[in-house]
A protein has these predicted regions:
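Nuclease catalytic cores that cleave nucleic-acid phosphodiester bonds
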Residues: 53-143
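Domain-level signal for Mg2+-assisted phosphodiester chemistry and nucleotide/NA-binding surfaces
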Residues: 1-83
Length: 143
């Protein structure tokens, strides 16, 4: 009887690490990020924002063109709904490298549209969520 209870235990939520460009998707392509992720993943998930990604968004919100500053500010507001994870990384570490290390450590998926980062993640068998045909989200890899 105990074994039956184990079979029906809920799975832990999927961890999804967000790259900065993933947070721009709702504003650039008018896509409801949360409902698209709900439809795509079909189970509980937890959005994770790493401190280097947040710092990158804050830098974009304070510098650059008016359009970029506005988009970055909106992305930061959306990022408030995510679990914030503080990483202790050297200043010289690239954001992409921090994302890759965190994905390995947390055994998490990554949501990014960066082709180079997607390729690097797929090379180490990390599932990647990305925007397909500017209209919907897709997964590359096994969840």
């Amino acid at each position: 009887m105990v074994q039956l209870g184990l079979m029906f235990r809920q799975k832990a939520p999927l961890k999804v690490i967000l790259d900065s460009n993933a947070l721009f998707v709702p504003f650039q392509f008018k896509i409801d990020l949360i409902s698209e992720l709900d439809n795509l993943l079909e189970r509980r998930y937890e959005l994770i924002l790493l401190s280097p990604v947040k710092q990158e968004l804050e830098a974009l919100a304070s510098k650059g063109s008016l359009k970029m500053r506005k988009a970055a500010s909106c992305a930061l507001k959306l990022a408030e709904k995510c679990r914030q994870v503080e990483l202790k990384v050297p200043e010289t570490t690239l954001v992409d490298d921090a994302i890759i290390e965190a994905a390995k450590d947390f055994r998490a998926m990554v949501f990014t549209n960066d082709r180079q980062l997607r390729r690097r993640l797929r090379d180490i068998s990390v599932p990647v969520i990305y925007l397909r045909q500017k209209s919907r989200l897709a997964i590359d890899g096994l969840v």
